[in-house]
Amino acid sequence: MSKVLEAKQSAVEEIKTKLSASASTVIVDYRGLNVGEITDLRKQLRDAGIEFKVYKNSLTRRAVEANGYEGLEGALTGPNAIAFSNEDVVAPAKILNDFAKDHEALEIKAGVIEGKVASLEEIKALATLPSREGLLSMLCNVLQAPVRGLAIATKAVADQKEGQEA
């Protein structure tokens, strides 16, 4: 087997593995961004633990078909980059959507969220959600509210009884 064919097969295997292992994957068209803007985007994604890589569309198409993600083939035209996140489902969509607001040249095309193909609208909706940490803090506040209310009521009763005794 030729070295070129082996390299292509290993690239397809790498893409398949990343697609199946990632919690969230977003495909973007980066045409029109200059090197400085792409470097800035890569830094933002890297800081959030997201891998951002450019693959040939033909190799990506083979990996997508092997993983059974029908519906992504239409997004695999033109210069594309793929953002893979293994932990946070919201982070790639949020970072890319915020970057696209400031840089109109970046176009979000489609993605895969927890094993399901997602359209542009679904990714934009996901981008409006708070991060995992934000959701956990909201949950903590909701769980603390009844206990806090009970503590305030108990203190009020104690203060009232002290006022009556005095």
Swiss-Prot record:
Gene3D superfamilies tied to this protein: 3.30.70.1730
Gene Ontology terms for molecular function: large ribosomal subunit rRNA binding; structural constituent of ribosome
Record-level GO cellular component terms: cytosolic large ribosomal subunit
Pfam families in the cross-refs: Ribosomal_L10
Family: Belongs to the universal ribosomal protein uL10 family.
Swiss-Prot/TrEMBL keywords: Ribonucleoprotein, Ribosomal protein, RNA-binding, rRNA-binding
Assembly information from the UniProt record: Part of the ribosomal stalk of the 50S ribosomal subunit. The N-terminus interacts with L11 and the large rRNA to form the base of the stalk. The C-terminus forms an elongated spine to which L12 dimers bind in a sequential fashion forming a multimeric L10(L12)X complex.
GO biological process: one example: translation
Organism: Listeria monocytogenes serovar 1/2a (strain ATCC BAA-679 / EGD-e)
Protein name: Large ribosomal subunit protein uL10
Higher taxonomy: Bacteria, Bacillati, Bacillota, Bacilli, Bacillales
Matching HAMAP family: Ribosomal_uL10 (MF_00362)
InterPro entries per UniProt: Ribosomal_uL10, Ribosomal_uL10-like_sf, Ribosomal_uL10_bac, Ribosomal_uL10_bac_type, Ribosomal_uL10_CS_bac
Task of the protein: Forms part of the ribosomal stalk, playing a central role in the interaction of the ribosome with GTP-bound translation factors.
Superkingdom, taxonomy of origin: Bacteria
